[in-house]
Amino acid sequence: MPEAQVVVNIGPGKDITLSTGKICKLANGSCVTRMGDTTVLSAACSGAAKPGQDFFPLQVDYREKYSAAGRFPGGYIKREGRPSDKEILICRMADRPIRPLFPEGFFDEVQVCGLLLAADGINDGDVLSMLGASCALCLSDLPFQGPIGALRVGMINGEYIANPTNEEMEKSSIELVYAGLPDKVIMIEGEAKECSEAELEGAMRFANEIVKKMCAAQVELMEKAGRPKKDPELHIVPEDMAAALKSVTGEKLENACLIPGKEARMKALDEIQAEAVEALKAEYEEKYGEEDFMFFLKMGFDKLVQKIIRTAILEKGYRPDGRGVTDLRPLTADVNVLPVVHGSGLFRRGETQALVIATLGGPQDAQETDLITGGVATKKFYLHYNFPNYSVGEVGRIAGPGRREIGHGNLAERSVKQVIPADFPYTIRCVSEIMSSNGSTSMASVCGATLALMDAGVPIKSPVVGISCGLVTDDTGKELILTDIIGAEDHYGDMDFKVCGTLDGITGFQLDLKLPGISIDTLARAMAQNKEARAKIHGVVRDCIPAPRPELSPRAPQMEVVKINPDKIGALIGTGGKNIKEITESTGAQVDIADDGSVSILAQNKAVLEEVKRKVQFYTAEAEIGKIYRGVVKTVRDFGAFVEILPGQDGLLHISEMANYRVQQVSDICKEGDYLTVKVIDIEKGSGKIRLSRKAALDELDK
């Protein structure tokens, strides 16, 4: 592979360099993508299809190593381990736009690996990895029908920005990750601060113009250094067997495909498939062999079901569960469904049901992530999504969260976090437990999280709800957008477009396609249809709980932030942490101290909170002129004694101020460790030195 490179300008002072041929020469295709000093290697390799495999085993991987930023991994083990959530999310984001661009029936193993080689802390490597994955596949001999372009779009003061820096993203009201062909969109994902549909559409059209440049640059690089494409081996059901399968299933299969209930429909389809196996086994098992016979039959049966469902939708507007094109499934919403917990919400849409639990905590419960590409990120709100086997009535391996669960939780989290006030002091964790599933569980999680937060008394700005729209097309260009898709429509349809938002705007979105791209116009129509559906769901949520509860759940911990003089932080902590340890151990409260003097207190109840506040005030109190204190003698000198009147605050009690008579020796009045009643008679400006008088204190107390 000869060395070659191209440069794409995506905005003022923003160039992306794509190069190949210098490193990673044994891969089918490789590319080094660079923007600023952030550099990502992408490599594509392939292997033969496994016997009996009836799907495309594309694997996309992305890793960020600390060495890319000139750092060591933290902790005892100085080596990176399992992928982080961020890396997993980038893998999913890179997978979705390239998967539809391989030919149907191509089942070879394909692996695309992204590796962050250098991180400048300004530009993130995620969209560079997506672009590099496309370029590596284009340069390879694999039957990839690209190239695609990929970039992030932000919006600051109404102006769109391509691949904004980390600093620019903090000011942006939209974060759109866009991937597509020169004339079509394939994947979008992101979040927004209640943006309008028009603003999101504008961001997509802005991104599409840059994608055209990216695709042209990759074509140029392919001409310089690309490998010739090989003819792929496609696994397609033989025509004779496909015709025989259609004949034996006939009208019975058509009727079964349109049974409204998921469980009843799946049972009927399984029975018909079993009958087809028995009917065709004798003839075709001998012809193709036992393994290939079952392979072709399952694939052919699935194709028949797909065609029946799609034809019914397109030609008759008839969906598998009997709804109209824009109809929603039956909706219900409940709150306060569990005891003990801080907040809970149960949201049901048809056969999909999500139970979400909200838990409130303090600053110590926030999640800190050391981002290699740009500092430490602290999350005060996080949402975890769990999809157990019983939610689909199946038995399976029980393990930790997979990529899908991490991805669904992230979408719901990004969508809901937009309405949580920035000054809300609590850390919040929402856990979505999917009770049953027939499509759009992530959107049910968004609705359930809104219910749980409002039940817990979290003062969210506005309820957030979500809904998914699907798409069915044919070869003539006819297309139909479906509102609130079920599992079968997701599986056999062309699109899963999730949009979340309040009544004022969009907060989160994600597009998955099986087609090699659709027009932005089609996506804009889907957004309009989605908006109408969200308004109906908002009505259901508000009927259940019109607004957040006026007070936090009585089961939630009490939290308050008090301000102290930053100079008193040392006094509050104490020598070796003595004071702060005494506070936390005696009360069981969490106390977090910020550099600006903000002290966050998290206590189990109001009484404990007040006790902690009293202790904080005691350790951080300022000496006042004219006030009498009971202090302990810390040091004795010939000229007087130093008395600690407040934690960390000593004052000089001069020998002349010890009594109403002449004191010959300090030891006649006190020794170290004695307690004395003294009055502050002066505090020196600038130095803050305190002068004390026992004589004045005794005179005042005798009055």
Residue ranges and their predicted role:
Residues 29-31, 123-141, 335-358, 438-458, ...:
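Conserved phosphate/anionic-ligand binding catalytic regions in large, soluble enzymes, centered on
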Residues 27-111, 116-123, 182, 189, ...:
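Glycine-rich, flexible beta-strand/loop modules in the N-terminal catalytic cores of phosphate-handling
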Residues 96-104, 139, 362-365, 388-393, ...:
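Conserved helix-loop functional segments at active or binding sites
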Residues 104-110, 145-147, 214-232, 263-264, ...:
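Flexible, glycine/charged-enriched surface loops at secondary-structure junctions
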Residues 141-260, 453-550:
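Mobile "lid/hinge" segments at catalytic clefts and subdomain interfaces of large enzymes
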Residues 1-7, 11-14, 28, 39, ...:
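Alpha/propeptide regions of enzymes that mature by internal proteolysis
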Residues 1-46, 233-376, 557-571, 579, ...:
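Extended amphipathic alpha-helical scaffolds
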Residues 555-559, 566-703:
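Single-stranded RNA-binding regions, centering on S1/OB-family and related RNA-binding modules
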